[in-house]
Amino acid sequence: MDLFYSNFDNDDKLITINQIDSKHIIRSFRKKIGDIIKITNGKGSVCEAEIIEEGKNIKVEIKRILNYKREKLSIHIAISPLKNISRFEWFVEKATELGINQITPIISEFTEKKKVNIERLERIIISSMKQSNQCYKPIINDVKDYLSFISNNNDEKIMANMKTDNKLDKGFIKSNNICLMIGPEGGFSDKEIIHALESNIKEITLGKNRLRTETAAIYSISAIKSLTN
């Protein structure tokens, strides 16, 4: 059964669906009054709900709610925004499919694009979450500058750096809250790398090939999940 999204609470009885999803439900999926649909709130709950009113904003009545536990492993990607925004949006979409927990755009010395449209990325995340049939919505944080981020985030941090020979293995993963930092196409500056090492941030290589920023991020998510499963 297809999955839809609404930010409902578990004690709600009725849900009003937004206009875009209402249109898809009625026109694309040909649902009608009396039909049952599945809705997630992106916080681990999925409800089965009956359509009770059609219109621009359809209304549904919750019949049953199922709650799902999240994996213990939490992966947070701090990544430099890309000049080609479509490639960055592709990363956000695929990272959501892979079950990422958080994404933070970070501005480092060689970052070419300083701003991102958080609202648009939020819509991409919701769409990808529904498509991949997940009930937890990743958090997309506001843009942070490099120094502010590494000073205020408490996750175990690992930095991707082509200049090191350290390979990603289980020895680098000491907790269930991991933050992997991915720099822009030119990588992090020498000054940023030194600051990271002084802040006890580990550095790893992702191989001999020079990867695009978005490729490096997706590869890293997959590698971490493979090592911890």
Annotate the PLM regions:
Residues 69-156:
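RNA substrate-binding interface of SAM-dependent RNA methyltransferases
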Residues 1-68, 119:
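N-terminal positively charged helical leader segments and presequences
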Residues 161-174, 179:
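Strongly charged, low-complexity linkers/loops
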